[in-house]
Amino acid sequence: MRAARNLIITLLVSSLLCGCTQTEQFKLYGESEEENTNISTWVGCGWSTKPGEKDAVSEAISIMEEGLKGKKPEYIIAFMTVDYNVTEIVEEILKHYPGVQLYGGTSCTAVLTKDGYHTSTNGALAVMGIYSENITFGVGGAEIGDEKSAREAGRAAITEAISNAGLDGKPDIVLITASPGHEEEILSGIEEVIGEDVPVFGGSAADNTIEGKWKQIANDRVYSNGVSVTAIFTSMKIGYAFESGYLIMEKEGVITKSSGRRIYEIDGKPAADVYNEWTSGKVFGKYANQTSGKVTILANATFYPLAKKVVGVDNKTHYISIHPESVNLSDRSISVFVNVSDGERVQLMHGTWEILLNRGQTTPAKALEKGNIEKGETAFGIYIFCAGTLLAIPENERDKLPLLVGQTIGAPFIGTFTFGEQGFIEGVGNVHENLANSIVVVG
């Protein structure tokens, strides 16, 4: 069975690569002004793994400018690993482009562009610059702390972003990079300003080792515990997709005791015991008989997550994926990375690394369909991929991910690996979940 799955992925990637060893096989926006005089959007992506912030930014921007064809970017997205000093990265970018709208944050272990999967012990940096006659960007941010709650920070960030765009009304879509831990409250604050019908897409900033070193970037500001957003106003087509991609299993129950991000009971029974039974002991079975201590189950639980089972206003059933983080063996509770409430129905899911990798093709394809965008029409994409699912994929398979994304959308893109994902589900609205991937495409 495993060999068959490996063969499927090999055939899929091979078919994508056939006939496209040269980038000219599909047209990129900004690639040839002479061939298409109707181009209104120029996009360049660059990257670097050079040591030192100055050299890394210089190399990444040099590559980015090739796609911009002499246009000065109005907006830049920057994703990087925490191996770099993020403040110095921001300062170097702004030296090249004073006053540019700058948005981004830190990524777990690597970053993505159409050129590949970029990782190094020196650090990895990716930038995407955009100049467009049909898109207006506004970046805003806020710190979470004594002066602002997470909800207030979300409200302040989107208010500033709209102001910096210089336009009134609701944006067409919002990008978000937040500090892990308060995502639902931040989304609520954003929705207080723009309503619940504007899609919000992005992910929680990450580091390499879950040590709290993550950063969020909003123009010239760098936060450790904050939120950065981009308000996008455009007449161009927008497509998006947001999914975990796991298989839905038969085991399900109702949360009967919970608090915040901890599940104490499912169907009136200790949550850990129920989860252990559902997974046939595959996640933490060897610790199941212990009655004290805490067991971290992140790695194994990646293949056996839970999901909130939600019925939307469209009467369709949707699944909001939950990553179990640890088990408290004393009270048999499970700590997770999303807010949970009594009465919510949860269901077991299951996945393999092959399924998680193949999302690099299926999710972008759904986004193109959603936006009614043809591959040749795509200007650019922003890709979000859960860091936990990345780490579940063997290292020697990870470089297939940008091949799948790039050949599916046929355009420049930038990607980051996150500690939580936010996106819009039709019939449900904007949600925070785990172990998901998403993409926004514009064309």
What positions do the PLM features span?
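Bacterial N-terminal signal peptides that target proteins for export
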Residues: 1-8
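Bacterial N-terminal signal peptides
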Residues: 9-16
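Extended, charged interaction scaffolds in large complex subunits
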Residues: 23-25
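Small-residue-enriched flexible segments
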Residues: 29-75, 80-85, 89-96, 100-381, ...
